């Protein structure tokens, strides 16, 4: 790790003089800068010392440094609310309507493997029952559930209802603090599916456009347009979902700084 950091800071020092402005995140790469700051604090640094390290060693801007320290401190406070017997449950649905060119997740398209959805769901429901028994025997309690994939909403409303009923029937959700379903592709979202999710107690859904530029969406293998994203978002709001998160990816095929700015503005 030390060698990696040395290489990054060396490259940063060599390249930055030729840039129109220094990157606000300095030499940091990746998606979790707060993890770095948290590690510093847990190793004995004060928040102030960690901030100095971020600014002077990693060249992070003062504004981003303050944000990173706040995020690290918040995460550490949240950890204190998690009990020794609290666990999180992940349920994977490895099917998608199409495969995005950048995707590295384990997933199959419905065109290729749609016939496997029902037997997969049969097996998954049995695994849910067996896993719930192990959780009870260990004295654990589920405090968060995340159903991801793939795209869980490739299941139709009846299959979704079956899955959610299996979870509710076998797990104790009385301590549940967060229940999320990654709806993901707007072309798989319908009012009927949203009603099933809401009635089962799901509190948060993901609707992930990645881009709001139709040419970019076509280039990455998506089978929907930007209008479908807006439609799905409105339907989720109408179904009563107040917590909706959305993923965007910069630098996709055909994307430019201007088209990505338009995506963010949308």
Describe each PLM feature range.
Residues 30-33, 213:
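N-terminal alpha-helical segment
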Residues 1-21:
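N-terminal accessory interaction module
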Residues 15-22, 42-89, 138-139:
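N-terminal [4Fe-4S]-dependent radical SAM core
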Residues 107-266:
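Conserved non-cysteine loop/helix-boundary elements of the Radical SAM core domain that shape
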Residues 92-107:
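Local cysteine-cluster metal-coordination motifs and their immediate loop/turn environment
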């Amino acid at each position: 790790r030390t060698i990696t950091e040395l290489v990054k800071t060396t490259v940063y020092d060599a390249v930055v003089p030729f840039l129109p402005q220094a990157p606000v995140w300095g030499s940091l790469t990746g998606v979790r800068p707060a993890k770095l700051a948290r590690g510093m604090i847990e190793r004995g640094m004060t928040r102030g010392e960690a901030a100095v390290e971020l600014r002077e060693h990693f060249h992070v801007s003062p504004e981003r440094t303050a944000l990173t320290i706040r995020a690290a401190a918040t995460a550490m406070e949240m950890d204190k609310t998690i009990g020794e017997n609290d666990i999180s449950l992940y349920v994977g649905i490895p099917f998608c309507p199409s495969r995005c060119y950048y995707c590295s997740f384990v997933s199959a398209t419905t065109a290729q493997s749609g016939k496997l959805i029902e037997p997969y769901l049969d097996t998954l429901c049995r695994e849910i029952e067996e896993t719930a028994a192990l959780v009870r025997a260990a004295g654990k309690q589920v405090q968060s559930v995340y159903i991801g994939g793939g795209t869980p909403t490739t299941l139709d409303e009846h299959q979704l209802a079956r899955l959610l009923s299996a979870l509710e029937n076998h797990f104790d959700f009385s301590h549940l603090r967060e229940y999320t379903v990654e709806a993901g592709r707007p072309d798989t979202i319908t009012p009927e599916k949203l009603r099933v999710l809401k009635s089962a107690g799901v509190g948060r859904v993901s609707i992930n456009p990645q881009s709001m530029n139709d040419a970019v969406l076509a280039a990455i293998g998506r089978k929907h347009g930007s209008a479908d994203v807006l439609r799905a978002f409105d339907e989720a709001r109408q179904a009563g979902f107040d917590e909706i998160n959305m993923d965007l990816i910069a630098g996709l095929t055909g994307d430019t700084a201007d088209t990505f700015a338009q995506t963010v503005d949308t």
